[in-house]
Amino acid sequence: MQFSAYMLDVITDSIYPARISVEGGFFKEIVPIVINDDSELDISGIILPGFIDSHIHIESTMLTPAQFAKLAVRFGTTSVVCDPHEIANVAGTDGIDFMIENSKSVPFNFYFSIPSCVPATCFETSGAILDSETIGELLKKDEAVALGEMMNFPGVINGDGEVLAKLEKAKELGKPIDGHAPLLSGKDLDKYMAEHISTDHECSNFAEAIEKKEKGMKIMVREGSSAKNMEALFDFSDRLDYWKNHESFGKMPNEVLEKRIHLPIFDFIVSDDKHTTDLIKGHLNESIKKAIDLEVSPISAIEMVTVNPSTHYNLNTGAIVKGMQADYVVVDNLNDLNILKTYVAGKCVFDGENVLFDVEETEFKNTFDVSKKESEDFEISCDEPSADVNVIRCFNGELITEAESATLETKKGFVQPDLEEDILKIAVVERYGGNSIANGFITGFNLKKGAIASSVAHDSHNIVVVGTNSEDMANAVNCLIDNEGGFAIVDGDFEDSLALPIAGLMTNEDSHEVAEKLEKLHKTAADFGCKLDSPFMTMSFMALLVIPAIKISDKGLFDCINFEFIDVIKN
């Protein structure tokens, strides 16, 4: 196949007309040409390399890899570096093998980073354990391009033997190591990076990202469903101040400074966790457009999802050059970025209207071993007339929480929530046969009635539930048990849910059906008073102990700064 078109050369940062030859799924020849008029070209618009999401957990879309691919190609995405950390916590190597095999059923490039922290910590119950020897074998797979995010930064800093052994396996094979180091700085950051950990996607402010970048880390700018860091990291005034304070500022001609200001400074744009309700509206194409709105140059933004991740992970895609796999998209222009066609290995997979491949239904043995619950399971006892309690404060669009305190009344020996002050109940129910339950309090949801529950609860994916009363919490959890996973919302006799029977994380359903059901749940939660844009996703991160400041696992309330359990009721 041969055609002529304008193409974006991400190696030279330029756009020019070229004759492009594709053979056997690879670019055979790229020849710049001279034209008198655009009508001489075979294809109108601009040819770009296919987009690469270099850090995403497919399970967070609630879709199988194949269903994800069917949706993503509509938006110009042809490749992902995915970390199957979620299903690995549920089902270990069987879960990882499922993701790899399912990904092979569709024309799309799935590269895998091997989960490094299963379980994420020793302070929670997961469905599996991946030790250093197992990780070493998984890293030898052809599909494995990196060691997944090292969330146990205390283990790295303190020289934990097993943690360091996992890192050594990646070093021996010459594979990059992804990081996870929220708010880590100074000497602790130096120790962390000394172990060859080369990326971070957890930066939530410009100063944090700059420190890591200047020390040699590659920064992933995250724009997901729950965590959105692009505005903070692409802030124009911060970029301007950075370059003004740069040692070379006084030597820069004005035209050079003007160009520098529109460079992103950082390296990749990633999703991390993306709900289907957001994904059906767009993927990296929308993130690129947002970056452009934040005054990042279009070519630089596109390079953050093409050649930059390709180079870092040693992928044979990400640029339109001889010998690389012919993954490319046709767009109308660099600003509107409307996807006209998408190609993978030289074959059209999206023609502007329809996806040109089918997805078959798949099965996976579930892991849901938990007994039905009663309202009494969600009570916190106290003999005093009131109790001073620790409270988790969550924020819209953020994974980070804050620790707060509240004084709550007791009734019949149980501590009561305070709906007027938005102090609700939260609990985590272990789903792997132990049936343990930890209860606590949370603020930020603003529910005025009912309860919501989820079997998506990072990272061990036990059941997490937030509610205004114990009875609705029990019923919401029992609904999930009946469905073998998913999301549920309950208020008295009212009940609605989205079943996720594949490991309690995913479904075979079409993306638009999933999105429609989830949107309905979001609307119901809003009708119940919830102010969060993505309440189920926000709730799912309340059990993620590796992100500060206070979270909850099936073993209790947890101080993520000092890595220790704390009492719900203060002494």
Swiss-Prot record:
<dbReference type="GO" id="GO:0000034">
    <property type="term" value="F:adenine deaminase activity"/>
</dbReference>
<dbReference type="InterPro" id="IPR026912">
    <property type="entry name" value="Adenine_deam_C"/>
</dbReference>
<keyword id="KW-0464">Manganese</keyword>
<protein>
    <recommendedName>
        <fullName>Adenine deaminase</fullName>
        <ecNumber>3.5.4.2</ecNumber>
    </recommendedName>
</protein>
<dbReference type="InterPro" id="IPR006679">
    <property type="entry name" value="Adenine_deam"/>
</dbReference>
<dbReference type="InterPro" id="IPR011059">
    <property type="entry name" value="Metal-dep_hydrolase_composite"/>
</dbReference>
<keyword id="KW-0378">Hydrolase</keyword>
<dbReference type="InterPro" id="IPR032466">
    <property type="entry name" value="Metal_Hydrolase"/>
</dbReference>
<comment type="similarity">
    <text>Belongs to the metallo-dependent hydrolases superfamily. Adenine deaminase family.</text>
</comment>
<dbReference type="InterPro" id="IPR006680">
    <property type="entry name" value="Amidohydro-rel"/>
</dbReference>
<dbReference type="GO" id="GO:0006146">
    <property type="term" value="P:adenine catabolic process"/>
</dbReference>
<dbReference type="Pfam" id="PF13382">
    <property type="entry name" value="Adenine_deam_C"/>
</dbReference>
<dbReference type="Pfam" id="PF01979">
    <property type="entry name" value="Amidohydro_1"/>
</dbReference>
